[in-house]
A protein has these predicted regions:
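Conserved nucleotide-binding/hydrolysis micro-motifs of P-loop NTPases
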Residues: 56-58, 78-80, 106-108, 146-149
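Short amphipathic alpha-helical segments
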Residues: 63, 112-114, 153
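Pre-Walker A adenine-sensing motif
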Residues: 2-21
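Conserved P-loop
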Residues: 19-89
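Phosphate-binding/switch loop-helix module in NTP-utilizing enzymes
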Residues: 77-136
């Protein structure tokens, strides 16, 4: 992946906000840019990384050895169910701080698409993670392929993303520009 190196404008803005006990939403339009940004974030982290990959793109890069990280624990729903992954994540962050990357809200909705209450389940899972991250001095990044319509962040399927004042919102636009929304 290094041959197509991307420099992110305003990366320091994101880096300054990734502090212990914080949760952030990362909105993106281009999945490749999201992976490049996550690669840059993780390369600068000292914390062990827990990556929950529900859209399988990151897993593909790791399995094909296009991305290598020594302090990475990767979870995906090809190998485990969401209800098996969550207790493992919560146990790990209760023992020591981690950088937790939840990729993505879109993938979680797809995983739970047969559940009538998928919206409530998705919001409950994300709030459970955010709350536990705050207690454990971990850092949480939740990614979503989303767009803004009438001041609300919406997934491509039209579902509105639950927003929380304690979660910072970062947007990757134009493939390499990072902005923060208050």
């Amino acid at each position: 992946m290094d041959k197509n190196h991307t420099t992110f404008e305003n990366f320091q803005l994101l880096e300054e906000n990734l502090v212990p006990s914080s949760s952030s939403l990362l909105f993106y339009e281009n999945a490749f840019s999201k992976i490049k940004l996550i690669q840059e974030i993780t390369s600068k982290q000292n914390l062990p990384i827990l990556y929950i990959d529900l859209d399988f793109l990151f897993s593909g890069y790791v399995k094909s050895k296009l991305l290598t990280m020594s302090n990475l624990t990767l979870f995906n729903t090809l190998e485990s169910k969401v209800n098996e992954i969550l207790p493992k994540i919560l146990t790990k962050i209760s023992i020591e701080p981690h950088l937790v990357i939840f990729d993505s809200i879109n993938g979680l909705y797809n995983t739970l698409s047969n559940d009538v209450d998928s919206g409530r389940v998705v919001n409950s899972i994300l709030m459970l993670l955010a709350t536990n991250v705050s207690f454990s001095n971990s850092i949480l990044i939740i990614s979503a392929l989303a767009g803004k319509k009438e001041n609300n962040w919406l997934l491509p399927n039209g579902r509105q993303i639950l927003e929380n004042n304690k979660m910072k919102k970062f947007i990757i636009s134009d493939r390499s520009k990072i902005t923060i929304e208050n």
